[in-house]
Amino acid sequence: MQFAPLLLGVFLLCGSARGSDSSASNAITCFTRGLDLRKETEDVLCPANCPLWQFYVFGDGIYASLSSVCGAAIHRGVITNAGGAVRVQTLPGQENYPAVHANGIQSQVLSRWASSFSVTPGTNNLALEAVGRSVATARPATGKRPKKTLEKKAGNKDCKADIAFLIDGSYNIGQRRFNLQKNFVGKVAVMLGIGTEGPHVGVVQASEHPKIEFYLKNFTAAKEVLFAIKELGFRGGNSNTGKALKHAAQKFFSMENGARKGIPKIIVVFLDGWPSDDLEEAGIVAREFGVNVFIVSVAKPTTEELGMVQDIGFIDKAVCRNNGFFSYQMPSWFGTTKYVKPLVQKLCSHEQMLCSKTCYNSVNIGFLIDGSSSVGESNFRLMLEFISNVAKAFEISDIGSKIATVQFTYDQRTEFSFTDYTTKEKVLSAIRNIRYMSGGTATGDAISFTTRNVFGPVKDGANKNFLVILTDGQSYDDVRGPAVAAQKAGITVFSVGVAWAPLDDLKDMASEPRESHTFFTREFTGLEQMVPDVIRGICKDFLDSKQ
């Protein structure tokens, strides 16, 4: 009988351990989410030393179920990063999960989710700690492997884009077609290849008032995005697409909300029928913010309905460019699978994103060309070919890059200013038609003239200003002072010398670092080889200015 208490104690200890398998001893990983748990109330054990910066937490007090359980527990103050026992209570979904910084974790905003959970201190701490020690390096006491969390994949690295799907949530589309629209958007999202190093997506719903459903930063896995799209609710109201587009262009693509530097910004606008408001102004705002707008129109107005449309040209005025690439039509929301791949191919065509703010479409380049007698007519033509080849690399438009040219001898002549031509074809034609002046060489006066009269009117614009000086000889006046003044006015100066142009003068005119802003060739035929270097120099300076 003396062994009975001992045996009873062993039995109770083992029974307690077995009981903890089903209720209190569920060891989880740092990234187990609320939706990974299957019980309404569950006691779990969080491990120690979780990387706080990797937690995804949505809400405060009540957390969306896609939040990390351990992250939420630390955020709430239930445990520290030393780990510990947590009781998780499943709750209904809700709207407007807030963003709050607490205990080293920044939770994120989420507009709506289907289920939630709360966290409180766990029970049976001693049993949990014992189990925790036994599974510190292997598996939980149940003998089962820990639940796998969603692996973050790199995604399609050939399709780097930040994309907002602006879906139609108006009464025009109705609940049934709204669900079909969500299915189509989900298919597009999957085919894009969403991932940490691939495309990131978010959703904005257009209705009476626009609503950002989730941001770029909220999800970087296709499964998460699919689930979030599935949970979107239909809002109803007028199809104020213009209002939603303007709101998205201004608010959606901030660095705080997940936008990435150097990645094209895209808004894909889904429109069932036609908008209730004006899209032209919204399109202008989007282009000013460097956003590439696509319009996917479904069930376009019939002939009888055209009288109800405010502006039948609303698509052409809203898209990034009216060249056919940015507009996409589907006859209905039924049988849309075949339209998924062509749309994805468009969205992944990085080189076609003409409205992104890049060095190619966000600069003003002024060419100051030497027309002195030492150049000669034939060499002057080679100089014009040089500036034409540089200009060809840039997207010239009324909202993009702009080109101006000044020819100088002792005098100066503005061949054309930044506002004279807004297409590449017209700029190249104007360059071809420049007539050789012949005369002396007063480069310093020409720099001052160009700074004042050519760059002066655009100094407060959005584009970055560049001056490329092309000369074949020594100036009769001072060049350093005027060049410094130009640089103080915000103009980056590149100097290109040919033949007898003194290297000291070229460096005196060039911006810092002078070595990378100074070019020289003995022969005029060597100018052609410098074209890529000058273009790269402009783009490097542009990118550096954006850091």
Swiss-Prot record:
<dbReference type="Pfam" id="PF00092">
    <property type="entry name" value="VWA"/>
</dbReference>
<dbReference type="InterPro" id="IPR036465">
    <property type="entry name" value="vWFA_dom_sf"/>
</dbReference>
<feature type="glycosylation site" description="N-linked (GlcNAc...) asparagine">
    <location>
        <position position="218"/>
    </location>
</feature>
<dbReference type="InterPro" id="IPR036609">
    <property type="entry name" value="LCCL_sf"/>
</dbReference>
<feature type="domain" description="VWFA 2">
    <location>
        <begin position="364"/>
        <end position="534"/>
    </location>
</feature>
<dbReference type="InterPro" id="IPR050525">
    <property type="entry name" value="ECM_Assembly_Org"/>
</dbReference>
<comment type="function">
    <text>Plays a role in the control of cell shape and motility in the trabecular meshwork.</text>
</comment>
<keyword id="KW-0732">Signal</keyword>
<keyword id="KW-0964">Secreted</keyword>
<dbReference type="InterPro" id="IPR002035">
    <property type="entry name" value="VWF_A"/>
</dbReference>
<feature type="signal peptide">
    <location>
        <begin position="1"/>
        <end position="19"/>
    </location>
</feature>
<feature type="disulfide bond">
    <location>
        <begin position="50"/>
        <end position="70"/>
    </location>
</feature>
<dbReference type="GO" id="GO:0005576">
    <property type="term" value="C:extracellular region"/>
</dbReference>
<keyword id="KW-0677">Repeat</keyword>
<keyword id="KW-1015">Disulfide bond</keyword>
<feature type="domain" description="VWFA 1">
    <location>
        <begin position="162"/>
        <end position="347"/>
    </location>
</feature>
<protein>
    <recommendedName>
        <fullName>Cochlin</fullName>
    </recommendedName>
</protein>
<feature type="disulfide bond">
    <location>
        <begin position="30"/>
        <end position="46"/>
    </location>
</feature>
<dbReference type="GO" id="GO:0005518">
    <property type="term" value="F:collagen binding"/>
</dbReference>
<feature type="domain" description="LCCL">
    <location>
        <begin position="24"/>
        <end position="117"/>
    </location>
</feature>
<dbReference type="InterPro" id="IPR004043">
    <property type="entry name" value="LCCL"/>
</dbReference>
<keyword id="KW-0325">Glycoprotein</keyword>
<comment type="subunit">
    <text>Monomer.</text>
</comment>
<dbReference type="Pfam" id="PF03815">
    <property type="entry name" value="LCCL"/>
</dbReference>
<dbReference type="GO" id="GO:0062023">
    <property type="term" value="C:collagen-containing extracellular matrix"/>
</dbReference>
